[in-house]
C-alpha cells in the first residue's frame, strides 16, 4: 500500500460530523475553563445550549453553589413569540433579574465552548442590558 492510499484511508475512516463537533466543543470548553473561575464577587455565568433549549446558571466555583438559574423551558420563556434567538434573549433578561435579586452585579461569562454567535450572543447581550457586567 502506498503512502497516498494510506492517507486516503485515514481520511475516510473516522467519526461522523456530529461527534467531531461535540468533541471540538468539549476541547474548547476545557481550554476556557482552565482560565475561568467564578468567585463570590464575580461568579461564573455558564450557558448550555441544546438544539431546542438554553439553560444558564450563575455559579460560585469556590463554594460549589448555583446562585441563580434560568432556562427556556420555563413558562415565561415558552410564551415568547419568535425564533430561538428571541427565547435566548428572554433567558438572558431572566438571569439578569434573578442575579440582581441575589445581589450579583459582576459575572464572568463562560460560553462553554459554544461560539459567541446567535442564541449565545443574544443571551449575553440581554443579560448586559439587564444590568449584569461581564
Curated annotation (Swiss-Prot):
One of its GO terms (cellular component) is cytosolic large ribosomal subunit. Keywords: Ribonucleoprotein, Ribosomal protein, RNA-binding, rRNA-binding. InterPro entries: Ribosomal_uL18_bac-type, Ribosomal_uL18_bac/euk. GO terms for biological process: translation. It holds the Pfam family Ribosomal_L18p. GO terms for molecular function: 5S rRNA binding; structural constituent of ribosome. Belongs to the universal ribosomal protein uL18 family. PANTHER family: 39S RIBOSOMAL PROTEIN L18, MITOCHONDRIAL, LARGE RIBOSOMAL SUBUNIT PROTEIN UL18M. Part of the 50S ribosomal subunit; part of the 5S rRNA/L5/L18/L25 subcomplex. Contacts the 5S and 23S rRNAs. This is one of the proteins that bind and probably mediate the attachment of the 5S RNA into the large ribosomal subunit, where it forms part of the central protuberance. HAMAP family: Ribosomal_uL18_B. This is Large ribosomal subunit protein uL18. The lineage of its organism: Bacteria, Bacillati, Actinomycetota, Actinomycetes, Mycobacteriales.
